[in-house]
Each structure stands twice: as structure tokens, then as C-alpha cells.
């Protein structure tokens, strides 16, 4: 038999080679297997795992040792205030993507009935985070992957979010209307031959890679979005840390104004905001 304390220590040691947060990973796996909170793990470290629990835990650890992200093993990832279902059909939501949500909530009029579009919604993270905070707004989300849309719809249903609609297709072309107050997106932006892709091999490549310069999807969105925004509407795009200057040039060439670069807590350029002229 193995206690929670012993299991946490053993797993943490095993995962040091594949994880920057081995102890947290160990605790999350134990939470999942034992169906207990982290507070319970700390409060009752002497509790013993039965043979079935040990077998399941061992299988999870083996998957993690092969580099599979903890979110896929658990089948869920927290984003904003939401616990979202995730599978290898969708990109794992990142904390830095919350910048898109924060900007929208802070800068658009709270009490008006606005229409927002989310392009390449994946798990629905951005669309659902905005929808849950602004239940009187209408959010239309698109994705070219039917499998991803299925996950997004499951997440919407799980959180009883009624003001978010999902559409299958490429970027803006899948949208049902052309009068959005803001369009947001976290499109693929990694160059096809970037070595970083190897570290992300478990996630859907089509949600990560975008041509030789990583800008193929962003170029399409910048050009298309003008026709789907109201005059003065906003376009927000997450991008790679070294792409800001090129994206700003693309936006200027397409007639956008009030173009600003937003940086993350590390001071890296992460998001471009622009307004339709």
C-alpha cells in the first residue's frame, strides 16, 4: 500500500525530468485519481491508495513521462473562472490568452448589448469567458475543426452558457453576420519549421503552425475582419513575442487605426489591438 504522502514524493521525483512543476503535477494526478481536493491531500497525507487507484495513477504517470500535457491526462484545464474539458482535438488554454478577455471586459461598454466574435475558438475558452461575464452580449465563435467545436459546445452546456453560438468554418467566413463590435482570436502563429513545435507535439498542429513566417492565418484575419466589424469596431489578436512589428505593419496597410501592442507580465509582446477606421 502507498500513502498520499509517499505517492506525492515518488511521483514528484519521477516527473522532474519532464515537468517544471513536478509536485503540482503529482498533486493534480492524485486529486483526479482519489477524487479529493488538494486541501484533502494536505490534510490527510496518511490515507492509503488501494490497488485500483495505484494502477490508474501509474498509468497517468507513464503518460506524463512521455511528455503528454497534464491537461490532456486530466481531461480538463482551468481558464478564467471556468473549468473546461480539453482533449487532443483542442489547444490547451494558456494563462496569457486571458489578456484577450481582460481587454474586452475592461474597454468595451459593459451595459450595452454588444456582438463579439471569437475566431478559432478551440475549447471555447475565450468565447465562454467573455460570455459568462457579459450574459447580455452575443458571442459567435468559429472553428474549422468539427471535433473542436464539439468540445466547445460541451463546455458551454456544462457551464449553462446560453449566449454563445458556434459555427464551423474558416475564420471570419464562418460568421453569420457582419456587424461585430469586436473580433478576437488566438490563431496559430508559430512558423512551420520552428523547433518549439516539437515540444508541443501532443497538441493539434493546425492550431499552432501557420506557414513559413507564422503569419499566414493572421494575415487572412486582419484582411477579412474589416468587413465583419462595425465602424470603430475592435480587432484583438494574440501573437508570437517577436511578431508585433510585422503585424502592426499589416494592420496599418489594411487601414486600421489606434493600433497598440499589449505585453504580458514578462514584458513580452503578446497581443495586438486595432480599430477599424
From Swiss-Prot:
Q: What keywords tag this UniProt record?
A: Methyltransferase, S-adenosyl-L-methionine, Transferase
Provide one Gene Ontology biological process annotation.
Answer: translational termination
Residues that hold S-adenosyl-L-methionine according to the record = 120-124, 143, 171, 186
List its EC numbers: 2.1.1.297
Q: Where along this sequence does the record place binding of substrate?
A: 186-189
Database matches in SUPFAM superfamilies: S-adenosyl-L-methionine-dependent methyltransferases
GO molecular function (one)? nucleic acid binding
Extract the Pfam families matched here: MTS, PrmC_N
Please list the reactions this protein catalyses: L-glutaminyl-[peptide chain release factor] + S-adenosyl-L-methionine = N(5)-methyl-L-glutaminyl-[peptide chain release factor] + S-adenosyl-L-homocysteine + H(+)
Q: What does this protein do?
A: Methylates the class 1 translation termination release factors RF1/PrfA and RF2/PrfB on the glutamine residue of the universally conserved GGQ motif.
Spell out the family assignment given in the record's similarity comment: Belongs to the protein N5-glutamine methyltransferase family. PrmC subfamily.
What is the name attached to this protein's record? Release factor glutamine methyltransferase
UniProt source species? Coxiella burnetii (strain RSA 493 / Nine Mile phase I)
